[in-house]
Amino acid sequence: MKGKRAFMSKSLFIAEKPSVAQEFAKALKVNTSRKDGYLESENTIITWCVGHLVTMSYPEAYDPALKRWSLQTLPFLPKEFKYQVIDGVSKQFSIVSRLLNRPDIDTIYICTDSGREGEYIYRLVDQMAGVKGKTRKRVWIDSQTEEEILRGIREAKDWSEYDNLAASAYLRAKEDYLMGINFSRLLTLKYGPTISAFLKADRTVLSVGRVM
């Protein structure tokens, strides 16, 4: 029975983008068939994100009234942060989520870019997909050569080894979010009308950071 289970189990490799997934397929030298959003062979599946698949929710996800910009609702400081799948990539998220939770997948190799942002991209997907009971290993490579990819897979560590990196990624994202949401709204509400009058524009939005 154990032998049968081992034969049936598969490893899932998840890259940050399709081009990198193709490099992993070449390095692994597996005979894959092309599926919708992933490659599959007898014992290996290779899939990919397309950059970020999940993002932090805007204030109106917490309360519809917060969609309207008002000084009375600032600062916006949620006790718990909400996340959502990005609309334009929801199809790929659904594919990846289904693969992550497939019963025949026992080991997940995290092959997103080796760095804080790559770690964050996968962690958000894992969080939203609600992955449970899988072995997760982090592939950390310096290039996408065949030799380096195979070394990274061979030396892959348990993903918990990168928990501190993930924590720093979450923290930075929350800081960017709070700065952007609060200061963009504050400055726009206070100075936007004056600037609009000077520029003879209908409306002026003052953007701070990457989130508004």
Can you say where each PLM-predicted feature lies in the sequence?
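Prokaryote-biased recognition of long, low-complexity C-terminal linker/tail segments
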Residues: A15, Y177-V211
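Intrinsically disordered, low-complexity regulatory segments
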Residues: M1-L187
